[in-house]
Amino acid sequence: MTLQTDDFAPAPARRVVSAAPASPQEQAIERALRPKLLQEYVGQVKAREQLEIFIGAARQRGEALDHVLLFGPPGLGKTTLSHIIAAELGVNLRQTSGPVLEKPKDLAALLTNLENRDVLFIDEIHRLSPVVEEILYPALEDYQIDIMIGEGPAARSIKLDLQPFTLVGATTRAGMLTNPLRDRFGIVARLEFYSAQELARIVKRSAGLLGVPMDDAGGLEIARRSRGTPRIANRLLRRVRDYTQVKADGHITKDIAERALAMLDVDPEGLDVMDRKLLEAVIHRFDGGPVGLDNIAASIGEETGTIEDVIEPYLIQQGFLQRTPRGRIATQAAFRHLGIAAAPGAQAPGLFAV
């Protein structure tokens, strides 16, 4: 007899279409596929053009680039851009994240070790603690930090000069940044979801680096189901590569991509089992809505935070779900996609339709 307690409950399976940060093994693969320079970077045309100008000007003057804030959904290339910025400037990159910097001394140790014009990348910068953020303000404005020496009545503050540097902050939740911190970034770039055509170019480049022969149609099929996100596109490419290696001749065609992605339960709109489960619950159990988030969570056995932060955003962006003051409503597009008699009220087509 097998006994199982909550302490040893299996972790939930990772969704193949999740844009969440990758596992360590996947991060290593991502680094190998990452473009190194702006000319290799696909998509984000506006942000790329702005950075080309600002980086070029800073390089010509021999100055540190203004501090850069990159924000947008996960998996769109914020970390990649931070590496590219450092490479284009020809300087070192130091990388950390907001939750890691628990105390002022953690940040001070990083800042005092930066060389002239170096880049400091802080991921999840919205999660900096207030006390650490206070230390950062004078560092960003004046390249100085105040640190406390000693304790009690003998404690005193000393000012340390820093080398001019560039902070690149990345966040998926720009609204959670405090106004004082946001105002200290001279360059702000929003990263948008990619079109299927842009993702097809990324998939083609990645396939070449992985040594996988692939038709353009096969690459486009992977791109169409990648939810506008390069991280997902590269993950699906690797899974399709595995499929064709075992089930076919190693060459990715449109037919092979379709069969592999069907096996992974990723449909032509990029929806997986969990997406469809949510839509079906709203339609079948709650007559299409409106229905509250707590009721949806109870009906599909997921936490409200997971639904709100992980599942819902893509369904809303694609026009399958509508968030209203009275609750969630399944749109006509959702009824059509699931092959159910459509409810009244047409919605706009999805963002990534080809």
Swiss-Prot record:
GO terms for biological process: DNA recombination; DNA repair. Residues 195-265 are annotated as: Small ATPAse domain (RuvB-S). Residues 5-194 are annotated as: Large ATPase domain (RuvB-L). Its EC number is 3.6.4.-. GO terms for molecular function: ATP binding; ATP hydrolysis activity; four-way junction DNA binding; four-way junction helicase activity. Keywords: ATP-binding, Cytoplasm, DNA damage, DNA recombination, DNA repair, DNA-binding, Hydrolase, Nucleotide-binding. Mg(2+) binds at T79. Residues 268-354 are annotated as: Head domain (RuvB-H). CDD domains: AAA. ATP binds at L33, R34, G75, K78, T79, T80, E141, D142, Y143, R184, Y194, R231. It comes from the Bacteria. It is an enzyme of class 3 (hydrolase). DNA binds at R323, R328. Its main location: cytoplasm. GO terms for cellular component: cytoplasm; Holliday junction resolvase complex. Residues 1-22 are annotated as: Disordered. It is found in: Cytoplasm. It catalyses: ATP + H2O = ADP + phosphate + H(+). The RuvA-RuvB-RuvC complex processes Holliday junction (HJ) DNA during genetic recombination and DNA repair, while the RuvA-RuvB complex plays an important role in the rescue of blocked DNA replication forks via replication fork reversal (RFR). RuvA specifically binds to HJ cruciform DNA, conferring on it an open structure. The RuvB hexamer acts as an ATP-dependent pump, pulling dsDNA into and through the RuvAB complex. RuvB forms 2 homohexamers on either side of HJ DNA bound by 1 or 2 RuvA tetramers; 4 subunits per hexamer contact DNA at a time. Has 3 domains, the large (RuvB-L) and small ATPase (RuvB-S) domains and the C-terminal head (RuvB-H) domain. The head domain binds DNA, while the ATPase domains jointly bind ATP, ADP or are empty depending on the state of the subunit in the translocation cycle. During a single DNA translocation step the structure of each domain remains the same, but their relative positions change. Belongs to the RuvB family. Homohexamer. Forms an RuvA(8)-RuvB(12)-Holliday junction (HJ) complex. HJ DNA is sandwiched between 2 RuvA tetramers; dsDNA enters through RuvA and exits via RuvB. An RuvB hexamer assembles on each DNA strand where it exits the tetramer. Each RuvB hexamer is contacted by two RuvA subunits (via domain III) on 2 adjacent RuvB subunits; this complex drives branch migration. In the full resolvosome a probable DNA-RuvA(4)-RuvB(12)-RuvC(2) complex forms which resolves the HJ. This is Holliday junction branch migration complex subunit RuvB. It comes from Verminephrobacter eiseniae (strain EF01-2). The gene is ruvB.
